[in-house]
Amino acid sequence: MYVSVAVMDTGIFRHMDFDTRIAGFADFVGRKKYLYDDNGHGTHVAGIIAGSGKGSNGKYRGIAPDTFLVSVKVLDKSGNNLCYPLKWYIWHLR
């Protein structure tokens, strides 16, 4: 069974702790098609959730290290947010 968590934040940088477990990406700020994080906060949150510990030789792991991530960029580099992505997410839960 696979579990995915949507990280609705500033985006996610590729990182050795979860790079192979990024299941999707949507950018509602810059409309870019590639994975990025222009602030770093979203990547930090992703590590807390799903970090495998690979980058720290097992010293630092997330609370669910086998979880897949879906990066939903809803915050710009200054942390400002948008309402539309939340409506999109709720619509797709149906």
Features from the language model and the residues they span:
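Subtilisin-like serine protease catalytic core
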Residues: 1-24, 32-84
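Cationic, amphipathic, low-complexity alpha-helical segments enriched
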Residues: 82, 86-94
